[in-house]
């Protein structure tokens, strides 16, 4: 029998194991909060467009940490809040995730899910008492917790796609995240109507009602 050529024999032999390569960092598409600084202005992007940028607990905590850093950084003079994608700034808290967590913890009598609201309210207070100017781009859906974030801004930009609401009453909750303060800017009849019914307002409505 003829000997197998060296080139063929080498191809048939199992390849030597390759050293493990480090995994690449998560692409920005997988990050729930994006952060960059342009011309001394910090730009924070809520990055869950498939969920209308609804706030997860991890997002709330990350936002709080970023804001503390921005507040302490003298090189940053202003802050911009925006949402990723064309459909919304922020639809509020991730109610589905909270509901699922509450159901799971109810079996053990735990109520750790309530920590989300504690952290969210602290985040809103941090924004509403922020020492640097804030601009909020309220393009698209801006509801519930999204209003809590956006209403902290000295300059709030609404568009023809803006849809504003405090829909908490539809799931048995009260309008929160500072709503008793910012809804009071409207005439009392409108304040009660929006707060009790969860009615949706357009960008033009928001301008007319000083939201």
Regions inferred by a protein language model and the residue ranges of each:
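Short, flexible helix-coil linker/hinge segments at the edges of structured domains or between repeats
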Residues: 110-112, 157-187
